[in-house]
Amino acid sequence: MALHKKGISFTLYEDAKEYSAVGAGIGFAPNGMRTMDLIEPAFRPLYEAICVGNKGEDAQDIFFEGMLVEEGLGRDKPWYGHSGWGHPDYVRKSAHRKTLLDIMTSFIPIENVKFNKRLTNIEQRPDGVTLSSQDGTTAECSVLAGADGIKSTVRANVLEHYPNQIAPVYAGAYCYRAVIPMAEAYEILGDLTDVAKIYFGHGRGAVTYRISGGDEFNYLLCVDDSLDGWKLEGAVTETISHEAMMSDFEDPRIDDRLRQLLTKAKPVKWGFFHHIRTASYYRDRVALIGDSAHASLPFQAAGAAQGLEDALVLSSILSEVAKMPERGADLAPFIKAGLSAYDSVRRPRAQKQLEQAAEVGRMIFFQHEEAGADMDKILPRLQQGRFNWLWFHDTNDDVKEAIKRMQKQISVGGPSVARI
């Protein structure tokens, strides 16, 4: 979207035979929406037409409310009714991924997209990059941006000197997830469906919120797996029996309403993986964006917005590179300066978000180093400005800073910076 809006020539290579979305619920915090406004102003009204927030005018600025997994769900606790976190300038909105994807891809000319292209090899040369696909075809480009997800092929090329950082790292937990009609969810949870919730517990947790205009209910039922570890190498999901799934929540201390939700989920373990360490988001002419760069745990609902920030900064850098008269090998120093600037601006922020999301995961399972199982310590950590740096950051400043750093690097190498 960003490249097209800026008039930069591009081709999008997609592994699948058509656009498809993995997962259900997705949303953008204020930083994500402001970034998308800078990428494509026409997106916002289309997005707002399909998204939904919490139910009730007085709950629109609540990000999540904290509850418990245990019997009673925490409604008898002194903190109940005061366990939400958010911000007066934050408005919670979520949508169904498939509907959102349909909107986003409507801004991408279909003639720029090639489907059924599974990337098998990347060859970097002084004058460009050659891509090889499984179907035997090759393609040439000046810059490759890998947005190929958590199991990225492009990541292996960028991090060839850091082989231990290529594969995603298991975070010691997995979840079962489902989307059900709101009527079914209401029968189980009643008005607890009105506002997005995170349920905390010893080794078990849950995340719930409304999507699809309020017609559907999206949820994750989470399991700590830090002792056993993930068994399937190269896979992030595992299909098991219904009985095995139910046994994960058989502890009688768990509220039965969560078990009722679990009966409606498919018996598939979705492993929580992330890229906890990444030495660089680029190498020479190849860059990483989105999950290929900084796949995160979902507990801050911030991964998608970080991908948008990547896209805005990188497309702005490439727009500057495109102004250069040099081509082929002569363009390489400008590309490297641009991608280095992109990395230096985006990586610290994206990695901080990733680390904070992992910390929230530890809170959910009562494993936080300082808060433990004490909700009177957990909730203040979430309520007292934790997300301000993330939500109210001006990504246009990042664009300016990245271009400034690119100019500085180029000026060291010669007078070409005068053309930027």
Curated annotation (Swiss-Prot):
Enzyme superclass (EC): oxidoreductase
Binding-site residues for FAD, renumbered to this chain: E14, G27, R97, D291, A304
InterPro entries (alphabetical): FAD-bd (IPR002938), FAD/NAD-bd_sf (IPR036188), FAD_monoxygenase (IPR051104)
Keywords: FAD, Flavoprotein, Monooxygenase, Oxidoreductase
Gene Ontology BP, a term: secondary metabolite biosynthetic process
Cofactor requirements of the protein: FAD
Phenotype on disruption: Does not affect tolerance to 2-benzoxazolinone (BOA).
GO molecular function: FAD binding; monooxygenase activity
Positions of the catalytic residues: R177, Y209
Induction line: Expression is induced in response to 2-benzoxasolinone (BOA) exposure.
EC annotation from Swiss-Prot or TrEMBL: 1.-.-.-
Entry similarity comment: Belongs to the paxM FAD-dependent monooxygenase family.
Known role: FAD-dependent monooxygenase; part of the Fusarium detoxification of benzoxazolinone cluster 2 (FDB2) involved in the degradation of benzoxazolinones produced by the host plant. Maize, wheat, and rye produce the 2 benzoxazinone phytoanticipins 2,4-dihy-droxy-7-methoxy-1,4-benzoxazin-3-one (DIMBOA) and 2,4-dihydroxy-1,4-benzoxazin-3-one (DIBOA) that, due to their inherent instability once released, spontaneously degrade to the more stable corresponding benzoxazolinones, 6-methoxy-2-benzoxazolinone (MBOA) and 2-benzoxazolinone (BOA), respectively.
Note: Fusarium verticillioides possesses 2 unlinked loci, FDB1 and FDB2, necessary for detoxification of antimicrobial compounds produced by maize, including 2-benzoxazolinone (BOA). The FDB2 cluster arose as a duplication of the FDB1 cluster with rearrangement and expansion by incorporating additional genes.
Protein name: FAD-dependent monooxygenase FVEG_12630
Species whose genome carries this gene: Gibberella moniliformis (strain M3125 / FGSC 7600) (Maize ear and stalk rot fungus)
